[in-house]
Design a protein with these regions (language model features):
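Alpha-helical segment proximal to the catalytic Tyr-Lys
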Residues: 126, 168-172, 235
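Short, flexible catalytic-loop segment of classical short-chain dehydrogenase/reductase
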Residues: 177, 181-196
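Rossmann-fold cofactor-recognition segment
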Residues: 51-66
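Short C-terminal tail/terminal secondary-structure segment
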Residues: 144, 227, 238-252
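Substrate-binding pocket helix/loop in short-chain dehydrogenase/reductase
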Residues: 97-98, 102-110, 207
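Conserved glycine-rich cofactor-binding loop
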Residues: 9, 16-17
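Catalytic loop of short-chain dehydrogenase/reductase
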Residues: 135-159, 163-172, 184-185
Length: 252
């Protein structure tokens, strides 16, 4: 199936590793062009090299920077001549339980994970035309809190609510808004979380036993799902929060 992504241009944040990078790879594989972001210039340059300099451009920015959104959209237009959508993927806040997290951690995560995403979505909404799309990489914690991820549990559901409101507001202009809710995907982040336990391998096995497909997902599987949702092939899909979790969410 042709997803209709050829020569379309997307900004993908947090794309130097993990789910953001997997999504950028899937978009490029389908013929799209991407502007990828990350905080470190060397990591951004490495990601651009891996994706191909003819199909990818990079920008070292911090999502918490109020001016980042406008710069990224301008970079897409300057490098590739158009702007068709954005995928907001931000690394997870530090793990911790309620009693362990500080005001400073909450504030930093709010600026980067929440407010940075809101700013980029607002800027994209002002620039996109009919057929544009705004995507958010969120978490299964949108539906059910994950033990030990208190800050993420507090912020991700709020972003899902923001995305739903945005979908209602932008729908009449033909602009879609979608969310992806990853479960246990085999990324550095998930392996780091597993490693916090006394027995990481036992922790992984226990987690896999609760997943109907009995395994962690791969970044490539997530990336292909993201590419489809961002593509014209999903032109009648908006306002959804799609679990990519191997069936871990048992509710409807």
């Amino acid at each position: 199936m042709d997803l209709g992504l050829k020569d379309r241009v997307y900004v993908v944040t947090g794309a130097t590793r993990g789910l953001g990078h997997a999504s950028a790879r899937a978009l490029v594989a389908e013929g799209a062009k991407v502007v990828v972001t990350g905080r470190k210039e060397d990591a951004v340059a490495e990601a651009v090299s891996a994706l191909g300099p003819d199909t990818a451009a990079g920008a070292a920015v911090d999502n918490a920077d109020p001016g980042a959104a406008e710069r990224l959209i301008a970079a897409a237009r300057e490098r590739f001549g158009r702007f068709d959508g954005v995928l907001v993927s931000v690394g997870g806040p530090p793990p911790g339980f309620v009693a362990d997290t500080t005001d400073e951690q909450w504030q930093a995560a709010f600026e980067s994970v929440f407010l940075g995403a809101v700013r980029l979505a607002r800027a994209a909404a002002a620039e996109l035309g009919e057929g544009g799309v705004i995507g958010f990489v969120l978490s299964g914690s949108v539906h059910e809190p994950i033990p030990g991820l208190t800050i993420s549990n507090g912020l991700r559901p709020g972003l899902a609510g923001f995305a739903k409101s945005l979908a209602d507001e932008l729908g009449p202009r033909g602009i879609r808004v979608v969310g992806l809710l990853p479960g246990r995907i085999d990324t550095d982040r998930v392996r780091e979380l597993d490693s916090l336990s006394a027995d990481p391998e036992a922790t992984r096995q226990a987690a896999e036993s609760r997943i109907p497909l009995r395994r962690y997902g791969t970044p490539e599987e997530f990336g292909r799902t993201a590419a489809f949702l961002l593509s014209p092939a999903a032109s009648y899909v908006t306002g959804v929060m799609l679990p990519v979790d191997g069936g871990s969410r048992h509710g409807f």
